[in-house]
């Protein structure tokens, strides 16, 4: 996992959150006043620039300059209000406000601002659902794989014929861009510094739903390829939403458990014993046909992912072939972030099963070979140790430079 917030950068986290909230509020205000219209069904960002949160994230010095400058502007505004309300101290108030503006460490605008698109602040309507990921796979296979490759590494059969090799999707690239900007790159295409196209525009070929779906699939593809080649998920990945069917109850979206309950997905094909229920998390069976086993013994898990598409999506995220999926388990934390993967037939959960860790956030990424592949060395069992660590190290995902 390479896109979290460092524990010692709480102030930066707060600054980014405030800046994002301010931009969203400004966008909503402009839209409400009729100063900007819609683009692809959502309010369009009316300016060619936005605050470069991704730059501030990697340049704390620049972020401090901006923070002090914002503070100076706030102080100057307060001084102006005080001067208008208090005549006797008018001169002193004006002077203090002017001095604050003069002494402020104004950052270079070209560093603080970055190019924006009309869809920069768009939000995906898909909820990162299994159905959307499955749809996105079909779109990707038809329109994207020839250049980006089946595994997303940018080595498709047409890649060598392009003026520039496609970027790999099996890395933190998707985590550095807001979903709205990824959407714009797909519909409007991309150009190099020389103005020549480096990626065709698909705005006339794909509908909005297809574009959002292929973005969802690229996230799953990135996770699976990263897990297979590097032993980690390159960026934090949410547990995909899907319908959950439990015995005697109406289907519910998996998102209903987000924020309250951990989730364990276990792939079963009818040939292995069902996992035991565990009060520490919701155990959800993933089956090839989306139906629960005919016989569920007492104390065994019986809730099932009620869609056959979940099988292929889980295999993609786990980075294993669909035929090798039975017995694989995925763990998500209470906030819905996927954190660990258990291999079939594994006797105990191990430290290396944790594929999304806060320790990787500061760039101290461990390779799969460097991690010790032994059970977690704690007085408790390996699974309990992993759950405790997941709770102690929550994911604070920064996408497009802003906290999600």
Question: Each PLM stretch: what is its role?
Answer:
Residues 78, 184, 203-226, 389-392:
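C-terminal capping alpha-helices of c-type cytochrome domains
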Residues 116-139:
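Electrostatic cytochrome c docking/interface patches
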Residues 136, 140-150, 199, 214-218:
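The canonical Cys-X-X-Cys-His
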Residues 137, 153-183:
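Gly/Gly-Pro-rich "capping" loops immediately C-terminal to redox-active cysteine motifs
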Residues 160-163, 185-212:
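Axial heme c-ligation environment in periplasmic c-type cytochrome domains
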Residues 195, 291-334:
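Short, internal strand/loop/helix patches
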Residues 228, 261-262, 319-404:
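Thiol-/selenol-based redox modules, centered on thioredoxin-like
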Residues 254-288:
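Short active-site neighborhood of thiol/selenol oxidoreductases, capturing the structured segment around
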């Amino acid at each position: 996992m390479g896109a979290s917030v460092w524990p010692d950068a709480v102030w930066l986290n707060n600054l980014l959150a405030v800046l994002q909230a301010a931009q969203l509020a400004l966008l909503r205000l402009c839209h409400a006043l009729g100063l900007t219209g819609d683009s692809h069904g959502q309010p369009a960002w009316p300016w060619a620039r936005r605050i470069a949160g991704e730059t501030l994230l990697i340049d704390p010095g620049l972020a401090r300059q901006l923070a002090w400058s914002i503070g100076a502007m706030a102080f100057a505004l307060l001084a102006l209000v005080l001067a208008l309300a208090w005549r006797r101290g008018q001169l002193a108030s004006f002077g203090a406000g002017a001095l604050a503006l003069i002494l402020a460490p104004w950052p270079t605008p070209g560093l603080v601002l970055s190019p924006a698109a009309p869809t920069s602040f768009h939000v995906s309507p898909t909820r990162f659902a299994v159905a959307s990921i499955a749809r996105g796979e079909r779109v990707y296979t038809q329109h994207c794989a020839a250049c980006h490759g089946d595994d997303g590494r940018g080595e498709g059969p047409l890649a060598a014929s392009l003026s520039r090799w496609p970027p790999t999707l099996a890395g933190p690239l998707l985590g550095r861009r807001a979903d709205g900007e990824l959407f714009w790159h797909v519909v409007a295409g991309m150009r190099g510094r020389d103005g020549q196209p480096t990626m065709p525009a698909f705005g006339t070929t794909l509908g909005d739903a297809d574009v959002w779906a292929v973005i969802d699939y690229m996230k799953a593809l990135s996770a699976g390829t990263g897990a297979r080649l590097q032993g980690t998920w390159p960026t934090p990945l949410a547990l995909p939403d899907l319908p959950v069917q439990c015995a005697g109850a109406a289907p519910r979206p998996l998102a209903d458990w987000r924020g309250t309950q951990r989730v364990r997905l276990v792939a079963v094909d009818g040939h292995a014993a069902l996992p035991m229920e565990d009060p520490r998390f919701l155990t959800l069976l993933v089956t090839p046909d989306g139906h629960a086993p005919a016989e569920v013994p007492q104390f065994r898990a019986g809730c099932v992912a009620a869609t056959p598409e979940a099988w292929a999506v889980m295999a993609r995220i786990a980075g294993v072939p669909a035929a090798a999926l039975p017995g694989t388990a995925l763990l998500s934390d209470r906030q819905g972030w996927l954190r660990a993967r258990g291999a079939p037939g594994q006797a105990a959960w191990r430290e290396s099963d944790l594929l999304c860790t806060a320790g990787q956030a500061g760039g101290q990424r461990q390779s799969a070979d460097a991690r010790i592949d032994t059970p977690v060395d704690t007085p408790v069992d390996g699974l309990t140790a992993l759950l405790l660590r997941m709770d102690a190290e929550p994911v604070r995902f920064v996408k497009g430079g802003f906290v999600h």
